[in-house]
């Protein structure tokens, strides 16, 4: 009966009676989770490739509870989602936000995924659009609210910069940034940073300008530093209090415009931008208070500079005002007394003139005594002696005055006297045609003898003396010998005629000398011998000095010729 034991101990086994439902029950769910995990990993890899997720997010989402398969759905519901509308922002800003590179940069900075949703619509299209058709917006998704806040703040900053650029280049009313929240039980709202207000739906950015008004300030007063404060602490305080964007722009602000690459042409001003008009007004009030304080500081600065400078007219030069040492500025007071100092120099030249005036009268008497002395010898002998010699008959004064004049024997008074007759004293033709060898006619007016010597002798006697008398013994005397002859003493009636001629000529008569004789010794000698030579000792060697008797006057060949100037002679 052993046969029945095994039969009783076990029944016939079939494929349906295989034991393993317990093991299969435990292994079946495991295979489904693995498959789900593989699909999730593939999806995560795709998101990472697109930049939508980060590896850290995948690792945090990998562990899944095996107890319930609803854990993944719960994790998905915990994601925070925000939507920022960019349909109405400026075109440049909208193009920048829709670029994949910009969205990747926002994802790296904030840790939240950013993607573009919807499409661009105009105002008319918005009014006619269906509820399912939404305008252009950015979809931001993150695991925590902080990550989403970072992404939204970054997007808002980009939009603000775009609004500012549009405001500087053209008038722009403002951009509408709408933040959408995904309704969920776990995340009712998306709070922002504690110091910034919440993002209400449909807010508009408004802006304003507050001009500083210190464009003409001195260089020593740094307006930019006074407005911004140490490390821009003043403007940062206004931003923290009002949530507005406040920064300095314009000339001297150091803010370069993106379009031109240089500062704006407008005067320095504070640019204010805020989503709400109330916040803009409060920020503007704070900026005005700040500028009032800066103006008060500048007034004190000017007062200080004016107190340092004695002359307020020189307040403007910044270099002088900026010098730290004050004593040099008090020194100009010392220069002021020096200004009268240049005035005395003009009087000193006048002072020397006064001493010069008294000195001049003192020496004046001696010059007065000398003045008559100097002109008298110059004029008296020439003017007084000549007329004085005319009235008296004494021949001595004229003879004494003649010796100083004889040195001018080369002046040839015959020429001057003969100019009245129109004849020259030189030979102008053959000797036989001149008067060198013949005596003068008795009654001719052309005879001109030496005024000093021939004045006392008649014309006939003078001519005969010239032809018959031998020459003087001393040839050196020349002219003085003939005037001193005793037989030629002048007579009163004959004296006046030569004196008148001397008065007219003002020169001493020329009686000739040995040099003149040598020029024409042949003809003169023949003439003398023809007239007769009484001296037996009249030797040929005496002939050269003898011709002094010949006057250097040229007589016309015909005594009846009419007198006329030589330049009018035919």
Swiss-Prot record:
<feature type="domain" description="KH 1">
    <location>
        <begin position="77"/>
        <end position="157"/>
    </location>
</feature>
<comment type="subunit">
    <text>Interacts with PRPF19.</text>
</comment>
<comment type="similarity">
    <text>Belongs to the KHDC4 family.</text>
</comment>
<dbReference type="GO" id="GO:0005634">
    <property type="term" value="C:nucleus"/>
</dbReference>
<feature type="region of interest" description="Required for nuclear retention">
    <location>
        <begin position="427"/>
        <end position="497"/>
    </location>
</feature>
<dbReference type="Pfam" id="PF23469">
    <property type="entry name" value="KH_12"/>
</dbReference>
<feature type="region of interest" description="Disordered">
    <location>
        <begin position="438"/>
        <end position="500"/>
    </location>
</feature>
<dbReference type="InterPro" id="IPR056149">
    <property type="entry name" value="PRP5/DDX46/KHDC4_KH"/>
</dbReference>
<keyword id="KW-0597">Phosphoprotein</keyword>
<dbReference type="InterPro" id="IPR047890">
    <property type="entry name" value="KHDC4_KH-I_first"/>
</dbReference>
<keyword id="KW-0694">RNA-binding</keyword>
<feature type="compositionally biased region" description="Low complexity">
    <location>
        <begin position="553"/>
        <end position="562"/>
    </location>
</feature>
<keyword id="KW-0539">Nucleus</keyword>
<dbReference type="InterPro" id="IPR055256">
    <property type="entry name" value="KH_1_KHDC4/BBP-like"/>
</dbReference>
<feature type="compositionally biased region" description="Pro residues">
    <location>
        <begin position="391"/>
        <end position="407"/>
    </location>
</feature>
<keyword id="KW-0508">mRNA splicing</keyword>
<comment type="function">
    <text>RNA-binding protein involved in pre-mRNA splicing. Interacts with the PRP19C/Prp19 complex/NTC/Nineteen complex which is part of the spliceosome. Involved in regulating splice site selection. Binds preferentially RNA with A/C rich sequences and poly-C stretches.</text>
</comment>
<dbReference type="GO" id="GO:0003723">
    <property type="term" value="F:RNA binding"/>
</dbReference>
<dbReference type="GO" id="GO:0006376">
    <property type="term" value="P:mRNA splice site recognition"/>
</dbReference>
<dbReference type="GO" id="GO:0005737">
    <property type="term" value="C:cytoplasm"/>
</dbReference>
<protein>
    <recommendedName>
        <fullName>KH homology domain-containing protein 4</fullName>
    </recommendedName>
</protein>
<dbReference type="Pfam" id="PF22675">
    <property type="entry name" value="KH-I_KHDC4-BBP"/>
</dbReference>
<feature type="region of interest" description="Disordered">
    <location>
        <begin position="391"/>
        <end position="410"/>
    </location>
</feature>
<dbReference type="InterPro" id="IPR036612">
    <property type="entry name" value="KH_dom_type_1_sf"/>
</dbReference>
<keyword id="KW-0507">mRNA processing</keyword>
<feature type="region of interest" description="Disordered">
    <location>
        <begin position="1"/>
        <end position="29"/>
    </location>
</feature>
<keyword id="KW-0963">Cytoplasm</keyword>
<dbReference type="InterPro" id="IPR047889">
    <property type="entry name" value="KHDC4_KH-I_second"/>
</dbReference>
<dbReference type="InterPro" id="IPR031121">
    <property type="entry name" value="RIK/BLOM7"/>
</dbReference>
<feature type="region of interest" description="Disordered">
    <location>
        <begin position="512"/>
        <end position="570"/>
    </location>
</feature>
<feature type="domain" description="KH 2">
    <location>
        <begin position="210"/>
        <end position="292"/>
    </location>
</feature>
């Amino acid at each position: 009966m052993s046969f029945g034991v095994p039969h009783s101990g076990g029944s016939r086994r079939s494929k349906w009676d295989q034991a393993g439902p317990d093991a299969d029950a435990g292994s079946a769910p495991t295979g489904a989770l693995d498959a789900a995990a593989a699909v999730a990993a593939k999806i995560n890899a795709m998101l990472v490739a697109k930049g939508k997720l980060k590896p850290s997010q995948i690792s945090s989402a990998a562990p899944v509870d095996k107890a319930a398969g609803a854990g993944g759905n719960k994790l998905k519901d915990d994601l925070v989602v925000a939507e920022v509308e960019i349909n109405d922002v400026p075109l440049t800003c909208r193009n920048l936000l829709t670029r994949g590179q910009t969205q990747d940069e926002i994802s790296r900075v904030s840790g939240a995924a950013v993607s573009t949703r919807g499409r661009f619509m105009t105002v008319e299209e918005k009014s006619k659009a269906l509820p399912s058709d939404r305008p252009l917006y950015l979809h931001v998704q993150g695991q925590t609210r902080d990550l989403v806040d970072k992404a939204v703040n970054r997007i808002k900053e980009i939009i603000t910069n775009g609004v500012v650029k549009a405001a500087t280049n053209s008038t722009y009313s403002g951009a509408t940034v709408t933040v959408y929240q995904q309704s969920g039980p776990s995340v009712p709202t998306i709070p922002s940073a504690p110091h910034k207000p919440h993002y209400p739906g449909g807010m508009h950015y408004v802006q304003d300008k507050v001009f500083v008004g210190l464009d003409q300030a001195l260089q020593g007063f740094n307006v930019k530093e006074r407005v911004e404060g140490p490390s821009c602490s003043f403007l940062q305080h206004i931003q923290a209090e009002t949530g507005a964007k406040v920064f300095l722009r314009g000339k001297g602000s150091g803010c370069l415009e993106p379009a031109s690459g240089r500062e704006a042409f407008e005067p320095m001003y504070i640019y204010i931008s805020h989503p709400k008009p109330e916040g803009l007004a409060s920020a503007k009030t704070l900026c005005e208070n700040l500028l009032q304080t800066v103006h008060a500081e500048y007034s004190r600065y000017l007062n200080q500079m004016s107190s340092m400078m004695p002359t307020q007219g020189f307040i403007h030069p910044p270099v002088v005002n900026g010098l730290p040492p004050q004593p040099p500025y008090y020194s100009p007071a010392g220069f002021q007394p020096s200004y009268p100092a240049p005035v005395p120099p003009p009087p000193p030249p006048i002072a020397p003139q006064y001493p010069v005036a008294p000195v001049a009268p003192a020496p004046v008497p001696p010059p007065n005594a000398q003045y008559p002395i100097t002109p008298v010898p110059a004029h008296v002998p020439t003017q007084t002696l000549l007329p004085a010699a005319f009235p008296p008959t004494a021949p001595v004064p004229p003879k004494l005055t003649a010796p100083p004049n004889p040195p001018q024997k080369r002046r040839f008074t015959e020429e001057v006297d003969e100019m009245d007759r129109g004849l020259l004293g030189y030979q102008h033709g053959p000797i036989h045609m001149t008067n060198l060898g013949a005596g003068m006619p008795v009654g001719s007016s052309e005879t001109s003898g030496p005024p000093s010597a021939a004045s006392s002798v008649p014309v006939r006697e003078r001519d005969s003396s010239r032809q018959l008398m031998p020459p003087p013994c001393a040839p050196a005397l020349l002219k003085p010998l003939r005037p001193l002859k005793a037989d030629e003493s002048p007579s009163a009636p004959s004296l006046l005629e030569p004196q008148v001629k001397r008065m007219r000529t003002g020169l001493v008569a020329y009686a000739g000398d040995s040099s003149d004789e040598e020029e024409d010794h042949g003809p003169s000698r023949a003439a003398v011998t023809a007239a007769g030579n009484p001296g037996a000792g009249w030797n040929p060697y005496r002939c050269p000095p003898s011709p002094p008797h010949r006057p250097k006057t040229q007589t016309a060949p015909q005594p009846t010729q009419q007198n006329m100037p030589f330049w009018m002679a035919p």
